[in-house]
């Protein structure tokens, strides 16, 4: 069994700082679990670790595809599994760090995912239906043909709804019937960082303001100039989609910033639903004065067990 330390928590809670200190202390390397940080050139809006942080500890699965390249849960799972095995084979301790709950669950629970290649023709037709009829209509259809999949997908997550319908139309089988679980060869402990909601929202708002000061608008402008359009999954994600109406002249910058804060608060509220499903979860207050000492004790006891 490969010892594996997962550090999870809502966005802006402090996962990066803690994971770097622990990885330095325990001869570790970090495998990012962030569906947005895989994209090159999307640095500020995804809150990637800084170059100095990435130089301090090796990081994996950051900057691996261009913003217009297809990227899926199955691809992520394969890459993360390979990275974890490589880190362990070199005698180092893998840390799985991030807040994309579905990616975490797929790796730590050993999901066996349907390997159905994207079908652009089917997807385009479904996207047209979504634009014409709304997400609720597609969700109702999914609930009719695959109740199990619908129960696991938020009704407003149109990309996952479309993917589930796409797999069904391509194969004739519900996506839920094509999934199974095979426990992976990991000895995992999950450290879940928490904060009271007001404190977390304050951190999120401060991060958003820091992103603006660091040049997020320039980053978005560069991406658009390079031909990456708003309908790409990368550009329609959190941190970028909120600025579309601003760049199109429909809202003010202050309104776009307020929208980003609001959307990030909502995202942070949804994240814990995934963390509760992870193996061997131990919660720690992210604002504890001895946070690193508490976390280091957990790691030491786990790898010695």
Curated annotation (Swiss-Prot):
Gene that encodes the chain: miaA
Family per similarity comment: Belongs to the IPP transferase family.
SUBUNIT field: Monomer.
Name of the molecule in the record: tRNA dimethylallyltransferase
Alphabetical UniProt keywords: ATP-binding, Magnesium, Nucleotide-binding, Transferase, tRNA processing
Site residues (Interaction with substrate tRNA), renumbered to this chain: 100, 123
Role: Catalyzes the transfer of a dimethylallyl group onto the adenine at position 37 in tRNAs that read codons beginning with uridine, leading to the formation of N6-(dimethylallyl)adenosine (i(6)A).
Recorded catalytic activity of this chain's protein: adenosine(37) in tRNA + dimethylallyl diphosphate = N(6)-dimethylallyladenosine(37) in tRNA + diphosphate
GO-annotated molecular function: ATP binding; tRNA dimethylallyltransferase activity
Record: residues binding substrate: 11-16
Organism: Roseiflexus sp. (strain RS-1)
Location of the region described as Interaction with substrate tRNA in the Swiss-Prot/TrEMBL record: 34-37
Signal peptide positions (record): none
């Amino acid at each position: 069994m490969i010892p594996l330390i997962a550090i999870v928590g809502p966005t802006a809670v402090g996962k990066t700082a803690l994971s770097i200190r622990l990885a330095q202390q325990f001869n570790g390397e970090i495998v990012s679990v962030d569906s947005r940080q895989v994209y090159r050139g999307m640095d500020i809006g995804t809150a990637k670790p800084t170059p100095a942080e990435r130089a301090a500890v090796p990081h994996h699965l950051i900057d691996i595809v261009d913003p217009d390249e297809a990227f899926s849960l199955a691809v992520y799972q394969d890459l993360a599994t390979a990275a974890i095995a490589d880190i362990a084979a070199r005698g180092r301790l893998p840390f799985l760090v991030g807040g994309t709950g579905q990616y975490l669950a797929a790796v730590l629970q050993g999901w066996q995912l349907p390997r159905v290649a994207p079908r652009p023709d089917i997807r385009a037709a479904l996207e047209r239906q979504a634009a014409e009829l709304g997400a609720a209509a597609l969700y109702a259809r999914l609930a009719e043909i695959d109740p199990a999949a619908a129960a696991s997908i938020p009704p407003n997550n149109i990309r996952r709804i479309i993917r589930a319908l796409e797999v069904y139309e391509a194969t004739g089988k519900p996506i839920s019937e094509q999934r199974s679980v095979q426990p992976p060869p990991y000895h995992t402990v999950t450290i879940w960082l928490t904060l009271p909601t007001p404190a977390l929202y304050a951190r999120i708002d401060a991060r958003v303001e820091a992103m603006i000061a660091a040049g997020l608008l320039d980053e978005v402008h560069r991406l658009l100039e390079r031909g990456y359009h708003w309908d790409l999954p990368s550009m329609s994600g959190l941190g970028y989609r909120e600025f579309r109406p601003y760049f199109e002249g429909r809202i003010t910058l202050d309104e776009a910033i307020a929208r980003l804060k609001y959307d990030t608060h909502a995202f942070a509220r949804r994240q814990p639903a995934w963390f509760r499903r992870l193996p061997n979860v131990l919660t720690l207050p992210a604002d504890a004065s001895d946070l690193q000492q508490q976390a280091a004790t957990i790691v030491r006891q786990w790898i010695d067990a």
